[in-house]
């Protein structure tokens, strides 16, 4: 009988330690605790007003014009061209145009 009493006492003490609220507040009505945070309020999203920023212009940098250095190119020698001498004929006869009578200067049929 002593072992039963001892085991029930250990069980009762273990229940008191393990249950965080304990048995004293079991029969009491729950106490109202207000919420830490307020109720959610539906607010329309606030749009930030656009800030007008003028475009930033880069300051012009003055660079003096740079001339390219002269390039040395060797002179190109063209091979000599051998053309036969052009012989002009003494009688230069031109053909009359089609459908026209030859003028007296070009008429060689006297």
Swiss-Prot record:
<feature type="repeat" description="10">
    <location>
        <begin position="79"/>
        <end position="83"/>
    </location>
</feature>
<dbReference type="GO" id="GO:0005576">
    <property type="term" value="C:extracellular region"/>
</dbReference>
<feature type="repeat" description="9">
    <location>
        <begin position="74"/>
        <end position="78"/>
    </location>
</feature>
<protein>
    <recommendedName>
        <fullName>Early nodulin-12A</fullName>
    </recommendedName>
</protein>
<dbReference type="GO" id="GO:0009877">
    <property type="term" value="P:nodulation"/>
</dbReference>
<feature type="repeat" description="7">
    <location>
        <begin position="64"/>
        <end position="68"/>
    </location>
</feature>
<feature type="repeat" description="2">
    <location>
        <begin position="39"/>
        <end position="43"/>
    </location>
</feature>
<keyword id="KW-0677">Repeat</keyword>
<feature type="region of interest" description="Disordered">
    <location>
        <begin position="31"/>
        <end position="110"/>
    </location>
</feature>
<feature type="repeat" description="3">
    <location>
        <begin position="44"/>
        <end position="48"/>
    </location>
</feature>
<feature type="repeat" description="4; approximate">
    <location>
        <begin position="49"/>
        <end position="53"/>
    </location>
</feature>
<feature type="signal peptide">
    <location>
        <begin position="1"/>
        <end position="24"/>
    </location>
</feature>
<feature type="repeat" description="11">
    <location>
        <begin position="84"/>
        <end position="88"/>
    </location>
</feature>
<feature type="repeat" description="1">
    <location>
        <begin position="34"/>
        <end position="38"/>
    </location>
</feature>
<keyword id="KW-0536">Nodulation</keyword>
<keyword id="KW-0134">Cell wall</keyword>
<dbReference type="InterPro" id="IPR051308">
    <property type="entry name" value="Proline-rich_CW_protein"/>
</dbReference>
<keyword id="KW-0732">Signal</keyword>
<feature type="compositionally biased region" description="Basic and acidic residues">
    <location>
        <begin position="45"/>
        <end position="81"/>
    </location>
</feature>
<feature type="repeat" description="8">
    <location>
        <begin position="69"/>
        <end position="73"/>
    </location>
</feature>
<feature type="repeat" description="5">
    <location>
        <begin position="54"/>
        <end position="58"/>
    </location>
</feature>
<feature type="compositionally biased region" description="Basic and acidic residues">
    <location>
        <begin position="101"/>
        <end position="110"/>
    </location>
</feature>
<comment type="similarity">
    <text>Belongs to the plant proline-rich protein superfamily. ENOD12 family.</text>
</comment>
<feature type="compositionally biased region" description="Basic residues">
    <location>
        <begin position="82"/>
        <end position="93"/>
    </location>
</feature>
<keyword id="KW-0964">Secreted</keyword>
<comment type="function">
    <text>Involved in the infection process during the plant-rhizobium interaction.</text>
</comment>
<feature type="compositionally biased region" description="Pro residues">
    <location>
        <begin position="32"/>
        <end position="43"/>
    </location>
</feature>
<feature type="region of interest" description="11 X 5 AA approximate tandem repeats of P-P-[VQRH]-[NKH]-[GKE]">
    <location>
        <begin position="34"/>
        <end position="88"/>
    </location>
</feature>
<feature type="repeat" description="6; approximate">
    <location>
        <begin position="59"/>
        <end position="63"/>
    </location>
</feature>
